[in-house]
Amino acid sequence: FIYHSYK
């Protein structure tokens, strides 16, 4: 699952 990993 992705939460903050877009940075």
From Swiss-Prot:
Domain of life: Eukaryota
UniProt name for this protein: Hypothalamic heptapeptide
Taxonomic placement: Eukaryota, Metazoa, Chordata, Craniata, Vertebrata
